[in-house]
Design a protein with these regions (language model features):
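C-terminal effector/interaction modules appended to NTPase cores
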Residues: 2-126
Length: 126
């Protein structure tokens, strides 16, 4: 019998973003569990919470992200200031401007809202 990891139990996959093209500083607001949000809190500083972002439009593409900084815990129904990594190539199609609100999704379920405060583009070193 194999032991399941916490990410397998929750239905989330932990993925490594191999090529990062930018970072977002943002306010994330998690929906309460009774409004369809997560049951448990997230730990932004751990670097293993990897949901996706998308615009609130029909058929909008999902953009993989990874939380890398923020408060120790953010529980459902709470908010916090965070920094997330954005997968390479997603910056060109997303239009991350200050004040833009994006859905935070796990699979197909919306679990929160992310409000962009600032975008940093990674410098290429060669």
């Amino acid at each position: 019998m194999t032991e399941r990891t916490e990410s397998q139990k929750s239905g989330l996959s932990t993925r490594i973003i191999s090529s990062v093209s930018g970072f977002l500083e943002a306010i994330v607001t998690l929906l309460p569990a009774d409004a369809g949000g997560r049951i448990g809190p997230i730990a932004p500083r751990d670097g293993n919470y990897c949901p996706a972002l998308r615009r609130a439009l029909p058929d909008a593409p999902s953009i993989p992200i990874r939380f890398i900084e923020g408060p120790p815990w953010i529980a459902p129904g709470q908010d916090g200031r965070v920094v997330v990594e954005i997968e390479d190539g997603a910056l060109d199609c997303a239009g991350f401007a200050s004040g833009v609100e994006l859905e935070l999704v796990e699979g197909k379920r919306v679990v929160g809202i992310l409000t962009v405060l600032r975008l940093w583009r990674e410098a290429m070193v060669g």
